[in-house]
C-alpha cells in the first residue's frame, strides 16, 4: 500500500508541476491535467474516508458539476448542465469584459463543494495550496482573486442544491436489519453488517422524475423447489463459484471495488480500502479525456455527465434493492445447498436485487459512449495504483458488461439481477442523453 500511495503522490506532483504553464488557455493540456488531478485527489479522499458507493456518487456529482459550470465559460456558447437538472438555481455568471482563469475557477468551485462533503479536509490543504500558489505566480492579483471568487460562488450555488437533496434528512435513521422470513435479505457473513443507505431512494434525482422511473420487473419468486427459476439461479451461482477459471477470478477481483471489505486474521480485523464502483468509472472518464486529447471544457463535461449517470443510477438501483429486499446467494446456498460454501468475493451489506455494479456501469457506459464514441477502445488503469491490475476494452459497453457478470463470478449476485440491473442502468443513461446531452 505504501508503494501505491507513493506512486499516486508522484503522479499528483507531476501534474502540479504543469499547472503554471499557460494557465490562461482553458484548452491547454495542463488545464486538463489539473482537472484530472482534482478528480484523482477526490478519489483518494473518498477511499481514505471510506464513503459508501451511493454517498460517493453524491460527492463526485456535486464537485464535478461545480467544476464544469465554472470552466464552461472558457468556451463561449457552451451550455449549462445544471439548467437541465432538477433542483438547481441559475449559476453565477462571470462579469463581461473581465479577465478570468477558468481552470483556477473550476478548481475553486470543485473544492468548495468537496470540502462540505468529506471528512478529511486537512488532507486537501497541501494539494489545494500547491495549485493555488502556482496560479498566483502566473496571474496578476486581480485576475487571480476574481477567478477564485467566481469559482467559490459557483461552488456555493451547487452546494445550495446539496443542502436540500434529501441527504441530511436520511442521516440518523434506524438500522436496516432485513426480515427473518424466507427469501428476504438478512445481514451476511463474515461481519453481518446492517443494510447500507436504505433510505437512498428518498434522494432528489437529477434527471429521473422519480426513483422508480426505471423500475425493473419483480425478481423471481423465492422458492425451495429445485425446478423453480429462483433455485436454479442460486444453484448456478454455486456451480460457477465451485468451478471458477483463472480468468473469471481475475474479472471478479478486478471489478470488486468493494469499500466494505474487512480482512480477518485470527482475532484481528482490518479494513482493506478500495476504490468505489463510481470512482472506478470516474477514472475511466479521466482515461478517455486524456487519451482523446480533449480540451478542459470537454473533459469537465465528461466528468460531470458521468457523475450524473452514477448518481441517478444509484438512486434507481437502491430504490429497488430495498423494495424487493432479495436474499443474497450466500444465505440461500448455505441454507439449502452447501452450509460450508463461501463466495469468492465478500458480499456487500445490502439487498441483492438489482446489481448495483450492473446498473451504474451501464448508465456510465451509455453516457461515455455518447461523448467519446461507441467503439472507444481503452486500457483501463483506474485500479492500477490500488490493486496492481489493468485491463483492455474495446468499448465502454464491453467494460460495463464485464463489470456486470463479475458479480456472478464473485458469488454475490444471481444472473437475473445483473441482467435486469444492466437494463435499468441503460435506461438511466438514455434518459440523460435525451434530456441533457442531445
What does each model-found stretch correspond to?
Residues 1-10:
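Bacterial N-terminal signal peptides that target proteins for export
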Residues 14:
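SAM-dependent methyltransferase catalytic region
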Residues 17-20:
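C-terminal motif of bacterial Sec signal peptides marking the signal peptidase cleavage site
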Residues 22-438:
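Acidic/polar surface patches and capping/hinge elements
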Amino acid at each position: 500500500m505504501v508503494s501505491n500511495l507513493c506512486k499516486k503522490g508522484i503522479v499528483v506532483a507531476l501534474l502540479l508541476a504543469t499547472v503554471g504553464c499557460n494557465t490562461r488557455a482553458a484548452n491547454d493540456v495542463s488545464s486538463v491535467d489539473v482537472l484530472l488531478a482534482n478528480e484523482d485527489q477526490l478519489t483518494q479522499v473518498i477511499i481514505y474516508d471510506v464513503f459508501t458507493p451511493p454517498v460517493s456518487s453524491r460527492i463526485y456529482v456535486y464537485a464535478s458539476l461545480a467544476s464544469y459550470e465554472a470552466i464552461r465559460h472558457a468556451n463561449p456558447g457552451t451550455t449549462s448542465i445544471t439548467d437541465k437538472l432538477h433542483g438547481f438555481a441559475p449559476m453565477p455568471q462571470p462579469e463581461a469584459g473581465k479577465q478570468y482563469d477558468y481552470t483556477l475557477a473550476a478548481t475553486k468551485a470543485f473544492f468548495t463543494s468537496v470540502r462540505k462533503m468529506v471528512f478529511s479536509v486537512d488532507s486537501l490543504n497541501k494539494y489545494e495550496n500547491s495549485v493555488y500558489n502556482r496560479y498566483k505566480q502566473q496571474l496578476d492579483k486581480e485576475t487571480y482573486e476574481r477567478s477564485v471568487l467566481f469559482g467559490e460562488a459557483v461552488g456555493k450555488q451547487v452546494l445550495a442544491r446539496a443542502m436540500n437533496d434529501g441527504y441530511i434528512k436520511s442521516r440518523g435513521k434506524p438500522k436496516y436489519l432485513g426480515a427473518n422470513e424466507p427469501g428476504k435479505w438478512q445481514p451476511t457473513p463474515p461481519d453481518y453488517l446492517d443494510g447500507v443507505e436504505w433510505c437512498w431512494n428518498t434522494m432528489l434525482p437529477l434527471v429521473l422524475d422519480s426513483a422508480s422511473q426505471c423500475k425493473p420487473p419483480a425478481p423471481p419468486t423465492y422458492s425451495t423447489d429445485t425446478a423453480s427459476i429462483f433455485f436454479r439461479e442460486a444453484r448456478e451461482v454455486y456451480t460457477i463459484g465451485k468451478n471458477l477459471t483463472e480468468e473469471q477470478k481475475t474479472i471478479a477481483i478486478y471489478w470488486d471495488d468493494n469499500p466494505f471489505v474487512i480482512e480477518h486474521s485470527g482475532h484481528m480485523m482490518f479494513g482493506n480500502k478500495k476504490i468505489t464502483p463510481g470512482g472506478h468509472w470516474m477514472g475511466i472518464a479521466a482515461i478517455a479525456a486524456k487519451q482523446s486529447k480533449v480540451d478542459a471544457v470537454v473533459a469537465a463535461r465528461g466528468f460531470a455527465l458521468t457523475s450524473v449517470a452514477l448518481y441517478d443510477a444509484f438512486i434507481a438501483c437502491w430504490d429497488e434493492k430495498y423494495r424487493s429486499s432479495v436474499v443474497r446467494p450466500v444465505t440461500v446456498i448455505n441454507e439449502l445447498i452447501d452450509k460450508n460454501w463461501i463466495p469468492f468475493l465478500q458480499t456487500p451489506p445490502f439487498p441483492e436485487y438489482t446489481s448495483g455494479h450492473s446498473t451504474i456501469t451501464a448508465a456510465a457506459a451509455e453516457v461515455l459512449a455518447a461523448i467519446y464514441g461507441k467503439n472507444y477502445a481503452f486500457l483501463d488503469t483506474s485500479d492500477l495504483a490500488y490493486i496492481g491490475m489493468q485491463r483492455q476494452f474495446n468499448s465502454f459497453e464491453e467494460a460495463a458488461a464485464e463489470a456486470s457478470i463479475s458479480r456472478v463470478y464473485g458469488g454475490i449476485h444471481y444472473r437475473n439481477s445483473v441482467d435486469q440491473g444492466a437494463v435499468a442502468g441503460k435506461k438511466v443513461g438514455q434518459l440523460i442523453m435525451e434530456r441533457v446531452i442531445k
